[in-house]
Regions:
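Anionic N-terminal interaction surfaces
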Residues: 2-96
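Beta-strand residues in well-ordered beta-sheet regions across diverse protein folds
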Residues: 99, 106-107, 146, 206, ...
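Transmembrane helix recognition focused on a "late"/terminal membrane span
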Residues: 139, 143, 161-221, 240-304
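Phosphoinositide-binding peripheral membrane targeting modules
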Residues: 75-142
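A short amphipathic helical element positioned immediately N-terminal to and/or at the very start
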Residues: 219-231
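Canonical pleckstrin homology
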Residues: 93-94, 120-123, 127-177
Length: 304
């Protein structure tokens, strides 16, 4: 277990914020990779921490201090990223908190221009459960995490200043957190109500009974245009995709109705092939939307 006063910068002494509800290492949280304090970084970090005030103080363990806070995009498959287009930035937005013991991830959602709020999702991985943690890339830095259970995740769209800071801090933190590997050996989801570790694919907390949205219901929502996105709370994406899907569905139904009740055309292929093509596009669109939504469901979305 790493000491809360573990030195990160050779040029600065450890400094923990006094008299605060959160224990923050000011020498790390508010400085750049060279250890020089940046007022703009302090202001941005304070704003981020204030928006996590509902959950972060509850998550922190005794002798656990906040070292650094930064934003990133959560892991997502290239196909889903291509399918979502520019919506992917809101879909995968996440806040990561580096402490002396672990890396915390908080799922967030946008609230207007440059505003966001915590979206009831919290995950955690201890440094002992990481077989490797590297920052890769220059123009578009990524945080690549290799877990002891064999899984790998990439958090992308890091700011360069954050990437430099992580390159400095992560080796020291991993070197000083060499405890036993947990049963999961990787990132785990925590119940936002009681903070118990949640079991993958079990959508009820065994400790407090909190119920979460599940994959079975998500599949039923596929029957509604844009329903998969509405189910996971992505309403703006759901409205856009729902409109497109509704138009495609109406086109197929209109052709089918005309074929059944109207005059049949001499060349059936001229009707069947375009209709089948639209139906195929509709199905592919639904399947492509299902996978990123299923990923959110597997990160546990509480039922109110």
């Amino acid at each position: 277990m790493a000491d809360p006063n573990l030195p990160i910068h050779s040029t600065r002494l450890p400094q923990i914020t006094p008299g605060s509800s959160l224990s923050i290492r000011e020498d790390v949280a508010f400085s750049d990779a060279q250890g020089k304090e940046r007022p703009r970084l302090r202001k941005a970090t304070d704003k981020t921490l204030s928006r996590l005030q509902e959950i972060l103080p509850r998550v922190l363990q005794p002798r656990e201090v906040v070292l650094y806070v930064f934003g990133a995009q959560a892991p997502i498959s290239p196909l889903s990223q291509w399918f979502l287009g520019w919506h992917v930035y809101g879909f995968t937005r996440t806040i990561l908190v580096l402490t002396n013991l672990r890396l915390l991830r908080f799922r967030v959602r946008g609230r207007g221009w440059n505003r966001w709020e915590w979206n009831q999702g919290v995950q955690s991985v201890a440094f002992a459960d990481l077989s490797e943690a590297q920052v890769k890339g220059f123009l578009s830095p990524q945080l690549v995490l290799d877990y002891r259970n064999g899984h790998k995740e990439r958090y992308w769209r890091l700011r360069r200043s954050d990437a430099k800071k992580l390159k400095l801090a992560l080796p020291t933190l991993r070197m000083n957190n060499t405890g036993p590997v947990s049963a999961s050996g990787g990132m785990v989801s925590l119940c936002p109500k009681c903070l118990a570790t949640l079991t993958p694919n079990t959508y009820r907390c065994s400790h407090c009974g909190q119920v979460f949205k599940d994959e079975k219901t998500l599949r039923r929502f596929l029957l509604i245009p844009g329903g998969e996105f509405f189910y996971v709370g992505q309403h703006s994406i759901g409205a856009l995709h729902g409109l497109v899907q509704a138009v495609w569905l109406l086109a197929v139904l209109a052709v089918a109705a005309g074929f059944m009740f109207g005059r049949r055309p001499a060349n059936l292929l001229s009707v069947v092939l375009p209709s089948a093509s639209v139906a195929l596009i509709f199905t592919v669109h639904k399947v492509a939307g299902f996978f990123p939504c299923r990923q959110l469901v597997r990160e546990f979305i509480p039922l109110k």
